[in-house]
Amino acid sequence: MPWRWPRPFKEKAMKVAFATQELQRVEAHFGWAKNLAVFELWPNGYSFVQTHSFDGDLKEDGDEDKLAPKIEAIKECAILYVAAIGGSGAARVVANRIHPVKVAQAEPILDILDKLQEVLKGTPAPWLRKAMQKGQERVINFEEEV
């Protein structure tokens, strides 16, 4: 997967994960996904980080243990794009401060990144601003507040 402009040195990247079978589109249920593609994203570009691949029986079977390695693989991500996600999977993703986003239909990963990048250039929605702060230390200087 391509780089999209040089990596900025001062800006902190936001990591975004995509549930995918074929590594091109978001078309997979989180629990059944064979792959989770991870990208870093800035307002002026993005880059591919890595693909986490999963083997074995990934079909719906009520076995929640198969979610643990997936959660571990994306724990540094702020956003997870999926075609679908079960209730317990969504709860575990949210508990790890990852915002799940369900796409209405299969959508190319690079198209989603382009759209998300444009949103970051403007005024992102509150949920996205919060997601962008994942992994950043929150410092409050009470002396500056009046």
UniProtKB/Swiss-Prot annotation:
Pfam family, one: Nitro_FeMo-Co
Coiled-coil segments: none
Any one of the GO BP annotations: nitrogen fixation
InterPro entries given in the database record: Di-Nase_FeMo-co_biosynth, DiNase_FeMo-co_biosyn_sf, NifX, NifX-like, NifX/NifY_domain
CDD domains for this protein: NifX
Keyword field: Nitrogen fixation
Highest taxon above the source species: Bacteria
Keyword Nucleus: no
Tagged with keyword Nucleotide-binding: no
MF terms (GO), sorted A to Z: metal cluster binding
Entries under NCBIfam families matching the protein: nifX
The family this protein is said to belong to: Belongs to the NifX/NifY family.
Protein name as catalogued: Protein NifX
